[in-house]
């Protein structure tokens, strides 16, 4: 049965659930590093403004995506850019479209805010469906 999540901006009350979600989603190997990344980005003033979205089902946070600001100045002209990382969905809710809904909602909001370019750190077979291309191939 597919879930019908509610996608919204994260609020302070969601903050405790986000590291727990990341650990559940990424496991004990990658989870601690992802939790550290989230913590670092949330307090890094150079990464502001952030777009932090959650997916909730029955009031429970089951998904989270974080977009942080990236500063680019090719040829001296600043380009509005963001970094998508990390994206986490609780294992019980994976493969139901929640991650895709979070990414799509985030990209739509960033586009509306005038962001020109979005980079992603993540699974190379997952993100092309959203229009992402590999920066290099090895």
Give the residues covered by each predicted segment.
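A short beta-loop-alpha structural element at the N-terminal edge
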Residues: 6-18
């Amino acid at each position: 049965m597919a879930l019908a999540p509610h996608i919204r901006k994260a609020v302070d009350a969601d903050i405790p659930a986000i590291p727990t979600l990341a650990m559940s989603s990424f496991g004990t190997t990658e989870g601690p590093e992802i939790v550290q990344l989230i913590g670092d980005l949330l307090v890094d003033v150079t990464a502001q403004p952030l777009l932090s979205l959650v997916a909730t089902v029955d009031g429970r946070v089951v998904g989270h995506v974080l977009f942080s600001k990236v500063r680019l100045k090719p040829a001296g002209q600043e380009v509005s850019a963001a970094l998508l990382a990390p994206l986490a969905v609780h294992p019980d809710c994976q493969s139901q479209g929640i991650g895709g809904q979070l990414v799509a909602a985030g990209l739509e909001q960033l586009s509306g805010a005038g962001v020109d370019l979005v980079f992603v750190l993540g699974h190379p077979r997952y993100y092309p469906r959203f229009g992402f291309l590999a920066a290099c191939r090895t």
